[in-house]
């Protein structure tokens, strides 16, 4: 007997912070000789023996102080890579002893960086990682839980018994253990015991995959097994400036875009079938499409309509479908509702193959209170701020990250980098930035704490966002970082080195509210609210804006875009076309939610499909053609995107004709020479002989008309284009005599070839006439 009963009891009761001090192989001196003692704790074993790796000889182990604590003394100074033969009832199994592997994956440098909040690839150290130690393959586990009394690993490999794989705690609060002979596909959890003896079963905060809800275990995954085919895309992205590129985003919720029959499982490339994931108990016959199915169906659909990017509502793992993904428990795990991590990689790869960028909604502002998640992770407020006035959103029922804690900030910053590193995404949209940067966001007086200067700004959260954006653009130039910021926080898209938050785009919430308020009015009243249309131009160049009509505008009894519009059915469709035509010619990148292209009559239903049956009707088919052509116009005309963020990209022709609810303006490309003229009529009253001044003489081709018959409009227009008249108007020497369709937007472009040809023809005529006159 080489060990005390107290030491054995600490192991048996899960109270030892370093089980390696007791278990595994140890050298001892007996009778002047150096020998090896091997100890094992196997709670379900009847007998255990040691198998020598040298001669495969078995050495029976004896129970010591506890019927399930075994030890064996072997007459050899050192014994490595031994195995344990365990008899459990009628079954026997042979395993490598986890406590024979003492080497750690985390170095002191790793731990120092993590403690400082600066380990940018900590997701490759913490979590579960397939590795090889001393020639034996297995999985290395590491989790940060500094205030826990004990942490163990649970899984099928130990019958979910937390006594069998107790972890070792390091001086920084990171617990670790290498478990040999297991690999990809293993489900696991952490069993965390606090100092009061309460036990919590937790998913891995750094886990790469989780089980399909309602199950909550993490899954061991090898993320390096996928072979990417997007090298050309990634290289091109590095040298691209998003500010000068066309960006038209199709915002999509994968779980409600379209469903498939639950009786027709999806096929994997190897011929096997994907597990069927039902949409809900209320729809037992419907299943979610998989990432691979979406890669084929959604990508081709989006490409056909001409969008440049797909933005996914949060794809990180979340337990509640009704949260739309905004209450995340698995920050490093794409949701298993739609397939595996490799399946999601395939989706991104397929997008890039088709020239489509991928944006992911990222939620660093809060997390849910689900017991298996981050909340109260080690028995204390670890990830959330301990002060509820800072650490809880009561109206949302969620917890707020402690942005002043280095390890928490490191968790989130590394998480943002992770999606770009491992999944090759092209951008993130950061959700609810205002809730992060203000202490008093949605909090009444008395329920928030001022910062150290007495203000409402959450300084640590703002600094965290600056850190994240600085890292993103340092590691991944050419990507997008988009803020959903609904207040007037200054310099959101300004560089961090001048005090900005460092995003490269911000949703223009003011434009969205102004335009929806305007279009919901009866057209007769719009003449009194011209400011709704024009106000955004006063500030459009102060930030890099993205115009967004998102999912938030078509839920919670707000009605669909089509349902918001006044008038009869024809006017409703015409209003939708006018709204989006103005949006796509207004400065700013574009985002619109799925279903608006149909458009739907009903609100978005997270458990339903889009109203695809509407495409059986001509009016809805016309709208789909409208959006295809609108995207083509936007992406093919540099004047509509190159100077979105510069004052020089926009000029009013006339913004004061409120009596007719008409506005006209010029959009210019970076060279200043390429331009388009847009005229918007926001009433059902058409106007003939409506005069608009233009900067250059010549023939102006009508390159887009939202009232085209092909879109379901009245087909009123300008017969392909107009020649200018020498009529001074709107401070220009020449002008156009136009026909403005009802609730219509028309876009014109100077046809330089036709204009030059006409000038040359005129000059030739004048030359001939002059020669004839001279001859006479």
UniProtKB/Swiss-Prot annotation:
It catalyses: Transfers a segment of a (1->4)-alpha-D-glucan chain to a primary hydroxy group in a similar glucan chain. Keywords: Carbohydrate metabolism, Glycogen biosynthesis, Glycogen metabolism, Glycosyltransferase, Transferase. The keyword Chaperone does not apply. GO terms for biological process: glycogen biosynthetic process. Pathway: Glycan biosynthesis; glycogen biosynthesis. Pfam families: Alpha-amylase, Alpha-amylase_C, CBM_48, GlgB_N. GO terms for molecular function: 1,4-alpha-glucan branching enzyme activity; cation binding; hydrolase activity, hydrolyzing O-glycosyl compounds. The active site is at 431 (nucleophile), 484 (proton donor). GO terms for cellular component: cytosol. Its EC number is 2.4.1.18. It comes from the Bacteria. Signal peptide: none annotated. Monomer. Belongs to the glycosyl hydrolase 13 family. GlgB subfamily. PANTHER family: 1,4-ALPHA-GLUCAN-BRANCHING ENZYME. HAMAP family: GlgB. This is 1,4-alpha-glucan branching enzyme GlgB. It comes from Trichodesmium erythraeum (strain IMS101). The gene is glgB.
């Amino acid at each position: 007997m080489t060990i005390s009963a107290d030491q054995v009891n600490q192991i048996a009761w899960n109270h030892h912070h370093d089980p390696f001090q007791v278990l595994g192989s140890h050298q001892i001196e007996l009778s002047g000789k150096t020998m090896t003692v091997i100890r094992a704790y196997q709670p379900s074993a009847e007998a255990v023996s040691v198998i020598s790796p040298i001669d495969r000889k078995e050495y029976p182990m004896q129970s010591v102080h506890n019927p399930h604590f075994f030890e064996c003394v072997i007459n050899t100074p050192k014994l490595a890579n031994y195995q344990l033969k365990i008899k459990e009832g009628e079954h026997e199994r042979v395993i490598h002893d986890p406590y024979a592997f003492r080497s750690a994956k985390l170095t002191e440098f790793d731990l120092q960086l993590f403690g400082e909040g600066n380990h940018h690839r900590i997701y490759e150290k913490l979590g579960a990682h397939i590795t090889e130690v001393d020639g034996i393959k297995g999985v290395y586990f590491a989790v940060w839980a500094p205030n826990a009394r004990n942490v163990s690993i649970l899984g099928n490999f130990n019958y979910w018994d937390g006594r069998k794989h107790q972890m070792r705690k390091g001086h920084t609060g990171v617990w670790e253990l290498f478990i040999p002979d297991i690999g990809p596909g293993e489900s696991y959890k952490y069993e965390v015991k606090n100092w009061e003896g309460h036990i919590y079963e937790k998913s891995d905060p750094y886990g790469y995959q989780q089980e399909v809800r309602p199950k909550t275990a993490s899954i061991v995954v090898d993320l390096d097994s996928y072979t990417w085919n997007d090298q050309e895309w990634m290289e091109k992205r590095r040298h691209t400036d998003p500010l000068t590129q066309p960006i038209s985003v199709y915002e999509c919720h994968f779980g409600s875009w379209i469903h498939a029959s639950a009786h027709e499982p999806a096929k994997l490339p190897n011929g096997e079938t994907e597990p069927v994931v039902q949409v809900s108990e209320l729809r037992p016959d419907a299943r979610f499409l998989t990432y691979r199915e979406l890669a084929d169906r959604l990508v081709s659909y989006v490409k056909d309509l001409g969008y440049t990017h797909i933005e996914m509502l949060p794809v990180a793992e979340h337990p509640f479908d009704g949260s739309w993904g905004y209450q995340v428990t698995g920050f490093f795990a794409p949701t298993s509702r739609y397939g595996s991590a490799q399946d999601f990689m395939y989706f991104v790869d397929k997008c890039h193959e088709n020239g489509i960028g991928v944006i992911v909604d990222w939620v660093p502002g809060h997390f849910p209170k689900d017991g298996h998640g981050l909340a109260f992770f080690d028995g204390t407020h670890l990830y959330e701020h301990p002060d509820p006035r800072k650490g809880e959103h009561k109206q949302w029922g969620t917890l707020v990250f402690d942005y002043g804690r280095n390890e928490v900030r490191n968790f989130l910053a590394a998480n943002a980098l992770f999606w770009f590193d491992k999944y090759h995404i092209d951008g993130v949209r950061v959700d609810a930035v205002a809730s992060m940067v203000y202490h008093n966001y949605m909090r009444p007086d008395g329920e928030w704490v001022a910062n150290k200067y007495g203000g409402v700004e959450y300084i640590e959260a703002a600094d965290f966002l600056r850190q994240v954006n600085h890292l993103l653009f340092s590691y991944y130039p050419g990507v997008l970082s988009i803020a959903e910021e609904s207040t007037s926080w200054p310099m959101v898209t300004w560089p961090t080195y001048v005090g900005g938050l460092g995003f490269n785009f911000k949703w223009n919430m003011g434009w969205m509210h102004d335009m929806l308020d305007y279009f919901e009015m009866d057209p007769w009243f719009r003449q009194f609210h011209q400011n709704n249309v024009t106000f955004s131009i006063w500030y459009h160049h102060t930030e890099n804006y993205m115009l967004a009509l998102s999912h938030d505008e078509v839920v919670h009894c707000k009605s669909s875009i089509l349902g918001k519009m006044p008038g009869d059915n024809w006017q409703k469709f015409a209003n939708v076309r006018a709204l989006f035509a103005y949006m796509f010619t207004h400065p700013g990148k574009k985002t619109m939610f799925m279903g608006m292209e149909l458009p739907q009559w009903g609100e978005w239903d997270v458990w339903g499909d889009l109203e695809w049956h509407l495409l059986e009707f001509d009016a809805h088919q016309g709208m789909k053609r409208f959006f295809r052509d609108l995207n083509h116009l936007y992406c093919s005309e540099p004047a509509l995107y190159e100077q979105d963020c510069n004052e020089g990209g926009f000029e009013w022709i006339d913004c004061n004709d409120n009596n007719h609810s008409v506005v006209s303006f010029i959009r210019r490309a970076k060279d200043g020479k390429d331009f388009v003229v847009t005229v918007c009529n926001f009433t059902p009253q058409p106007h003939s002989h409506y005069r608009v001044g233009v900067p250059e003489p010549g023939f102006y081709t009508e390159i887009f008309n939202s009232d085209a018959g092909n879109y379901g409009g009245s087909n009123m227009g300008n017969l392909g284009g107009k020649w200018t008249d020498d009529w001074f108007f709107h401070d220009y020497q020449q002008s156009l005599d136009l026909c403005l369709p009802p609730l219509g937007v028309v876009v014109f472009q100077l046809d330089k070839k036709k204009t030059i040809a006409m000038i040359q023809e005129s000059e030739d005529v004048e030359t001939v006439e002059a020669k004839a006159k001279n001859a006479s």
